[in-house]
């Protein structure tokens, strides 16, 4: 069901109103300097924040950072985020002493229309992740309505994503969540065809649900990353010291059989880059998958596989990518992932819809420097996967229907 969004709210709805906005400001911090090392998530929230400012709302932002487990941790305070956000907005952002309590109420009561305040880290209170109703009520007490723009936590029923919606009306989606839903749901429900899905990562177990769902939806399924060795072993091939999930061999067989039955083109790499140890400076060699020697482990897909994958993708109108092709953190084993990133960037330029489905593949396209060239980069890891699996996300379900 489509959800009501910020776009549905007029200046008359918002002027002078206190709007609680759940954002995802869980940004990476440089441990040595305490500075923000990547402000992508802060920038991603700007369209919603700027729209609310323009419409005269009093904007109260709330987010978590890290895993403080209900304790106040000085290194997880949101003060650096408030500073960076004020630079991006070109106006002061009031930093609140907590996320609930008298100090917060006092700070918000002083706000003028168009001002922005940031509450302190929600997870300094254990009640946030427990979705405690009293905590949710206190959080909602300083606001008139609610906007959720934190897609990365939409798959969690927390006080700030689900609990507060019981006390604030309307409760609507922000622009970032709206964009995520538009792209990800369209990708699996009404895609331009052929639709290819590229699934990577080290373990089959973490991607079972998404592979099973995609086998019902896509025309081509390309598998890369460490999980390929479980498929090879299931076929009876020797995989040396490569990562294998022994308890998933039957599942790998059944997924491959299901692809055949559904008429989905199922592609595994034909060659791999091997290493003698898991190390960035390991000895390496490229071999056909039938010739993996004992004592070696596969850490990337090989150049022949890249060509096969590129050929398979060349006529696709929609491509969804989740998970790297190899250990891209080691330059020696990043070629497969880099090549797929460049291939998708080139396809986007010719009109193909390319969606990077959260997690490590986002880091990969950013590392290669082609993030801007993709149609859509999802800000959610687990949330993206669950949405692609067809699961209901509590943070989305709790919002008002359009």
Curated annotation (Swiss-Prot):
Q: Which GO terms describe its biological process?
A: gluconeogenesis; glycolytic process
Its annotated pathway reads:
Carbohydrate degradation; glycolysis; pyruvate from D-glyceraldehyde 3-phosphate: step 2/5
Write down the SUPFAM superfamilies for this protein, in alphabetical order: Phosphoglycerate kinase (SSF53748)
Catalytic reactions of this protein: (2R)-3-phosphoglycerate + ATP = (2R)-3-phospho-glyceroyl phosphate + ADP
**Can you tell me which residues the record assigns to a coiled coil?**
none
Q: Where is the signal peptide?
A: none
Name the positions where ATP binds. Answer: 207, 298, 329, 358-361
Query: Where is the protein situated, by its record's location annotation?
Result: Cytoplasm
Known EC number: 2.7.2.3
Assembly with partners or alone = Monomer.
Similarity section: Belongs to the phosphoglycerate kinase family.
HAMAP family, per this entry?
A: Phosphoglyc_kinase
The protein's name is Phosphoglycerate kinase
Q: Which organism is it from?
A: Microcystis aeruginosa (strain NIES-843 / IAM M-2473)
């Amino acid at each position: 069901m489509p959800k009501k969004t910020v776009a549905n709210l007029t200046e008359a709805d918002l002027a002078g109103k206190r709007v609680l906005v759940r954002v995802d400001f869980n940004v990476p911090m440089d441990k040595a300097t305490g500075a923000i090392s990547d402000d992508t998530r802060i920038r991603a929230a700007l369209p919603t924040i700027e729209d609310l400012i323009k419409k005269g709302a009093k904007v109260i932002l709330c987010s978590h950072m890290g895993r403080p487990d209900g304790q106040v941790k000085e290194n997880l305070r949101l003060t650096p985020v408030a500073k960076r956000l004020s630079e991006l907005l070109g106006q002061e952002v009031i930093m609140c002493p907590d996320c609930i309590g008298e100090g917060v109420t006092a700070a918000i009561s002083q706000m003028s229309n168009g001002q922005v305040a940031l509450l302190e880290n929600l997870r300094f209170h254990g009640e946030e992740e427990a979705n405690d109703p009293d905590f949710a009520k206190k959080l909602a007490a300083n606001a008139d309505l609610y906007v959720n723009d934190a897609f990365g936590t939409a798959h969690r029923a927390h006080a700030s994503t689900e609990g507060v919606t019981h006390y604030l009306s309307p409760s609507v989606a922000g622009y970032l969540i709206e964009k995520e839903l538009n792209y990800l749901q369209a990708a699996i429900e009404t895609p331009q065809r052929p639709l290819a899905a590229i699934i990577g990562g080290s373990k089959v177990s973490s991607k079972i649900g998404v592979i099973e769902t995609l086998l019902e939806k896509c025309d081509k399924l390309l598998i890369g990353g460490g999980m390929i060795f479980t498929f090879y072993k299931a076929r009876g091939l020797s995989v040396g010291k490569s990562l294998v999930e022994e308890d998933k061999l039957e599942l790998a067989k059944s997924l491959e059989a299901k692809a055949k039955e559904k008429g989905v083109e199922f592609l595994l790499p034909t060659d791999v880059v091997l290493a003698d140890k898991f190390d960035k400076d390991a000895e390496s060699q490229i071999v056909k998958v039938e010739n993996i020697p004992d004592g070696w482990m596969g850490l990337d897909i090989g150049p022949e596989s890249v060509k096969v994958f590129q050929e398979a993708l060349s006529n696709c109108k929609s491509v969804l990518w989740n998970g790297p092709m190899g250990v891209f953190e080691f330059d020696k084993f990043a070629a497969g992932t880099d090549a797929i990133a460049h291939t998708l960037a080139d396809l986007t330029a010719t009109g193909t819809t390319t969606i990077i489905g959260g997690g490590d593949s986002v880091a990969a396209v950013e590392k290669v420097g082609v993030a801007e060239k993709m149609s859509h980069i999802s800000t959610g890891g687990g949330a993206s996967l669950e949405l692609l699996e067809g699961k209901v996300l509590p943070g989305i379900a709790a919002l008002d229907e359009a």
